[in-house]
């Protein structure tokens, strides 16, 4: 995985993890942050570039520095969330212990009041809050002497009763309370509520909120909810920032919706606005049909007395979070322009803005137009396979992570590091729109579409500047700006790349497909032949029909001489081969238009791009349709030097500039593929010198590649091009080529 791909995948994981953190799903957030961290640490290119940062070029060094900053921030977020989970669990345990002690104290106080008024533990009419009988009082009163050995009946004679005969409950067996008991019970409950309000309550985490609190202290539930409202964490609306549709429909997202919807708290110096918002929010939630309505109907907290006490706890918690939050913005200044810290951020801030600020430290230093993950930024007419899909307007520049199209881009990055192949539903949709072709033949042609994943860019090809310029002018620019290339400027419908084998003709075709962002049909002779009579012509018709449907598109035919060889009149040519050539030429001619009389953009745009090592074997009619015929020669000294430097860029070697010049001089008449084979064989030299000991030698102990390795390999790897054949290429180029030499 390249450094650019590693950055994009890591950013996708981090974006979803930040959403998990904002919805208080800290466990899932930690897991995704750790996955993003492993994606960086386990990347071999990052490991290699990290050790050789001082010798890297500007672009790679920029990506490595960005990944290092991301790695630091991911570690900070993991540590912060781990501590947050531990603090919330400890706070929840304190709440549970407090509730248990409150229940014990209230039941003990009720028993003492009832005992003084004449209702002793032996009287079964004593009940606290409708739940406690005499036997339950015996289990909770731990201070009673010899409680485990005596019963209620044995305790009755030993307890001094002040007015046994005058007790209103002395002679009755009913569990219903009398008038005096009701008055005493209401006093106990008011004391119990006052003690609950005086306790500080922390907002429980999302995982703990699902378990619920004991039913005996339902007022504690209301206090917890009031604390969450004052904290600014309870929100009944959905998250305002965009997320991938695949994630929104997943079980994890459904589980997060069933609990609290929590947004990250931004500390503010003034808590009065937060308290007022908590009051309004609580009143609106209590009156709506929320999942907490049934729990809060019977016991509503006193808003005038509870919310101010919670605001004190809010101010304390705000200071603790403020010490960690600025760490996100501390690195954003390294990778991007300075952004306001959380302390200077406005109070009224939406969730989408907070998400964009959280992603600042993950924003790359530069967005490359060659990034395969940015295909959603272009219009549907420029996306090839995506032209049949309905998409939003394009996004440019820094709006890449702030626009509503973020969910499509994150989903595309999170699923794979390349554009996935067309699904069967997509194929059926395209074939239904093309009823004049057979369904099975159409599927066979669609399988020839090259799926992006091993993109080739102009910088990956050494030299060949004239060929690159010709391809940009004939293919790339017209596909990217069709409004400029109209009328007489209409691009050519055919282009031929010819030259010796191994000079980069196929690489140039792949680079054209990548740079023009078009559908790329890679066709060979076997793709258009069938054992059934007449199906080969139908395959050719289906090829051009689908190319028009999915335009802008490129039909690339490698070794075109095997498909469109010169037709003979002596009868030696097979009938099937002749019919295929005729149908191909007819369908190709249907792409041409009278350009001089047209002033509008020609749709669809389809280019037939071909490569051959035998240009003199191509049929005359096919040669006429190749308007641009570009010669790809053997690399010169400058190209060979550049190619060698690219091959040795990430290798451990001890070659000096003089050594490289010596290798360049010794590799005359070597093609690009010959130089690659030579460098690979020379790289095996240090391993060959170890012999059997290479099985036990560490990587660091292997010597670098030197000049002697190349001298030895030159004796083995010889040029593959015939010198007499080069003269024939030059003659054909002078006669039919786009530029004579």
Curated annotation (Swiss-Prot):
Keyword set, alphabetical order: ATP-binding, Coiled coil, Cytoplasm, Nucleotide-binding, Nucleus
Domain of life: Eukaryota
GO cellular component: cytoplasm; nucleus
Subcellular location(s) per record: Cytoplasm; Nucleus
CDD domains: RecA-like_VPS4-like (cd19509)
Entries under SUPFAM superfamilies matching the protein: P-loop containing nucleoside triphosphate hydrolases
InterPro entries: AAA+_ATPase (IPR003593), AAA_lid_3 (IPR041569), ATPase_AAA_core (IPR003959), ATPase_AAA_CS (IPR003960), MT-severing_AAA_ATPase (IPR050304), P-loop_NTPase (IPR027417), Spast_Vps4_C (IPR015415)
Biased composition (Low complexity): 161-173, 197-209, 309-318, 330-344
Gene Ontology molecular function terms on file: ATP binding; ATP hydrolysis activity; microtubule severing ATPase activity
Residue ranges of the region described as Disordered: 137-214, 280-318, 330-364
One GO biological process term: microtubule severing
Regions annotated as coiled coil: 64-103
PROSITE patterns hit by this protein: AAA
Entry binding sites for ATP: 499-506
Listed Polar residues bias regions: 137-155, 298-308, 346-356
Family statement drawn from the similarity comment of this UniProt entry: Belongs to the AAA ATPase family.
Protein name, as recorded: Uncharacterized AAA domain-containing protein C328.04
């Amino acid at each position: 995985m390249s450094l650019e791909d590693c950055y994009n995948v890591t950013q996708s994981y981090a974006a979803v993890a930040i959403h998990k953190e904002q919805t208080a799903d800290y466990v899932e957030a930690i897991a995704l942050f750790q996955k993003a961290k492993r994606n960086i640490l386990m990347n071999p290119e990052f490991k290699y570039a990290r050790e050789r940062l001082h010798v890297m070029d500007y672009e790679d060094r920029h990506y490595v520095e960005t990944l290092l900053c991301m790695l630091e921030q991911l570690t900070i977020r993991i540590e912060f969330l781990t501590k947050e989970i531990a603090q919330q669990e400890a706070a929840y345990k304190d709440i549970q212990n407090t509730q248990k002690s409150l229940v014990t104290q209230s039941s003990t106080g009720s028993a003492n009041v009832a005992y003084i008024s004449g209702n002793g533990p032996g009287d079964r009419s004593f009940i606290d809050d409708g739940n406690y009988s005499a036997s339950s009082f015996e289990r909770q009163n731990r201070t009673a002497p010899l409680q485990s050995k005596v019963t209620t009946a044995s305790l009755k004679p030993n307890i001094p009763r002040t007015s046994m005969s005058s007790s209103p409950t002395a002679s009755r067996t009913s569990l219903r309370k009398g008038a005096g008991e009701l008055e005493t019970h209401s006093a106990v409950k008011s004391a119990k509520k006052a003690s609950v309000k005086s306790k500080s309550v922390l907002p429980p985490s999302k995982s703990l909120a699902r378990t619920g609190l004991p039913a005996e202290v339902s007022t504690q539930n209301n206090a917890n909810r009031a604390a969450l409202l004052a904290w600014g964490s309870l929100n009944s609306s959905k998250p305002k920032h965009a997320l991938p549709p695949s994630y929104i429909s997943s079980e994890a997202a459904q589980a997060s919706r069933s609990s609290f919807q929590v947004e990250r708290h931004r500390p503010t110096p003034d808590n009065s606005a937060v308290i007022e918002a908590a009051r309004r929010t609580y009143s609106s939630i209590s009156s709506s049909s929320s999942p907490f309505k049934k729990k809060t109907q019977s016991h509503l907290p006193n808003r005038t007395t509870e919310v101010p006490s919670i605001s004190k706890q809010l101010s304390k918690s705000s200071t603790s979070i403020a010490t960690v939050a600025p760490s996100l913005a501390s690195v954003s200044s390294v990778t991007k322009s300075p952004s306001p810290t959380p302390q200077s951020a406005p109070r009224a801030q939406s969730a989408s803005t907070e998400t964009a600020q959280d992603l600042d430290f993950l924003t790359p230093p530069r967005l490359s137009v060659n990034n395969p993950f940015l295909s959603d930024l272009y219009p549907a007419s420029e996306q090839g396979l995506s032209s049949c899909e309905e998409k939003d307007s394009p996004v440019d520049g820094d709006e890449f992570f702030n626009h509503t199209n973020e969910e499509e881009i994150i989903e595309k990055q999170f699923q794979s590091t390349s554009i996935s192949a067309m699904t069967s539903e997509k194929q059926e949709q395209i074939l239904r729109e093309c009823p004049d072709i057979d369904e099975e033949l159409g599927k066979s042609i669609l399988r020839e579409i090259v799926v992006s994943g091993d993109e080739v860019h102009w910088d990956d090809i050494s030299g060949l500047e004239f060929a690159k310029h010709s391809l940009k002018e004939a293919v790339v620019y017209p596909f990217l700006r069709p409004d400029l290339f109209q009328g007489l400027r209409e691009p050519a419908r055919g282009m031929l790349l010819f030259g010796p084998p191994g000079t980069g003709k196929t690489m140039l075709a792949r680079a054209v497909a990548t740079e023009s962002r078009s559908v790329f049909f890679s066709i060979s002779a076997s793709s258009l032949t069938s054992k059934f009579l007449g199906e080969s012509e139908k395959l050719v018709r289906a090829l051009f029909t689908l190319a028009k449907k999915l335009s802008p598109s490129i039909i690339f035919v490698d070794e075109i001489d095997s498909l469109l060889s010169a037709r003979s009149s002596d009868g030696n040519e097979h009938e099937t081969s002749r019919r295929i050539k005729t149908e191909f030429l007819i369908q190709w001619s249907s792409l041409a238009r009278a350009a001089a009389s047209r002033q509008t953009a020609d749709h669809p745009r389809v280019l037939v791009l071909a490569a051959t090592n035998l240009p003199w074997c191509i049929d005359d009619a096919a040669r006429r349709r190749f308007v641009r015929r570009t010669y790809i020669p053997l690399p010169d000294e400058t190209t060979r030097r550049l190619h060698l430097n690219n091959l040795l860029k990430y290798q451990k070697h001890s070659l000096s500039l003089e050594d490289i010049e010596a290798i360049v001089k010794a590799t005359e008449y070597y093609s690009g593929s010959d130089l690659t084979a030579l460098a690979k064989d020379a790289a095996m030299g240090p391993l060959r010198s170890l012999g059997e000991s290479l099985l036990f030698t560490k990587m660091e102990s292997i010597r670098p590649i030197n000049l002697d390795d190349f001298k030895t390999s030159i004796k083995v790897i010889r040029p593959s091009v015939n010198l007499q054949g080069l003269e024939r290429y030059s003659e054909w180029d002078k006669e039919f080529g786009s530029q004579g030499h």
